[in-house]
């Protein structure tokens, strides 16, 4: 996201708070949106129409959005049991406070971002698979030196992109600041 302009806009429009690399929107009690600097949005308690409006707004501030936009839908509910449980696509919480939801949002956002890395790697492998397969089958590569260099360059760029962004998967500062 274009994070600073997004925050400035949202701070004028609705209740928005910024904590390092996360914007938190709380339009109503028990309704949260967590917007991560790296382009992932986790919503809790939004109805379908409000979700669509927010996503449409966020796309205006997106930088190189994935095509198509990746969406995952999970259900959460309050549970009388202690702690947090995730089974299939159901998250059960004994506490649906903003802090608990934000901690889960960090995990879900990182999972979504990791899935996008996996998709990009899979596409690169599928696009270049013919090179080692042809080499193994025929002993030669049916590409010019220039074409082969381009393919190697694309693979290198993909690797560099992922390595440079892999720090997104570190333990979020939020969890160090709020260990409870």
List where the protein language model places each region:
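Short, intrinsically disordered, mixed-charge
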Residues: 56-63, 119-126, 167
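Hydrophobic side chains in well-ordered alpha-helices
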Residues: 6, 53-54, 113, 117-120
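Membrane-associated alpha-helical segments
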Residues: 125-126, 132-180
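Short, charged/polar micro-motifs that form catalytic or ligand-binding hotspots
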Residues: 44, 107, 148, 152
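Short Lys/Arg-enriched alpha/beta "domain-start" segment
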Residues: 1-95
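A short mid-domain helix/strand-loop element embedded in enzyme catalytic domains
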Residues: 84-100, 118-142
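Glycine-rich beta->alpha junctions and the first turn(s) of the following alpha-helix
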Residues: 102-115
